[in-house]
């Protein structure tokens, strides 16, 4: 009895999910000669699978699918039928917390967990993939927490991540994606005045993003859509925030400046449900590199 009810519920969710993602054929269809990368904070991969993640992953035909906040333990990694040739999970030492994953259509040259110094290990927050043409860094940036209690650690993280990306960039172009846990400018948050100095919109965190862009990286969405308001990637579950589009743009793709000529598209799939975040993505034409 419970199984039948659960199946019907899942089928209903998946039908809604398919209807919603069908609004994005230009973003989610394979294009010869192009690289498509999608990032999504799934807020628990097992829960998101029940809400249609597998269907989305198999249907959107991304070359790389990067997930954050997977909340899965190494001994319980889901063996789902995703249409990717290669995958890696990086789990936190604390069970049911944080975590990142990367799915790829082809096996990369190398994969690395975390980044120096070792202070940042243990929470499963970063995976670096090396391909022939670029480094891809998938990250789930620490939240500064209530009262900005973890802001000093967050500031150190931002500084160390910036140095790491700059070192990679000397070797190959870099793509950084993930939940960066900051709304950079007022245009990136529905209610900037009410959230001044809240976690994710503090002056310090916003400055950290500014320093990263000044270090030679480009916010792909703002590069192509510099003045478009009301584009968000996270909404609180409270008070119908998503239905009213009272959100924050916390999820990004940043690229090395020399990849800008390759940038074909940057998009936010705000109608795709399954998490309190929605997927974001880019399309690159690496023939222009």
Regions found by a protein language model. Give the residues of each.
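Conserved beta strand-loop-helix elements of the APE1-like EEP
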Residues: 95-111, 239-261
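Active-site-proximal beta-strand elements of phosphoester/diester hydrolases
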Residues: 35-43, 133-145, 177
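N-terminal, active-site-proximal structural segment of metallo-dependent hydrolase catalytic domains
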Residues: 23, 27-82, 86-88, 92-98, ...
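Metal-dependent phosphoesterases centered on the DNase I-like endonuclease/exonuclease/phosphatase
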Residues: 64, 84-86, 157-250
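Structured beta-strand-rich core segments of catalytic domains in phosphoester-bond hydrolases
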Residues: 71, 77-144
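Surface-exposed cleft-lining segments at the edges of enzyme active sites
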Residues: 116-117, 141-158, 193-198
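Active-site beta-strand/loop signature of hydrolases that rely on acidic residues for catalysis
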Residues: 41, 57-75, 136, 165-186, ...
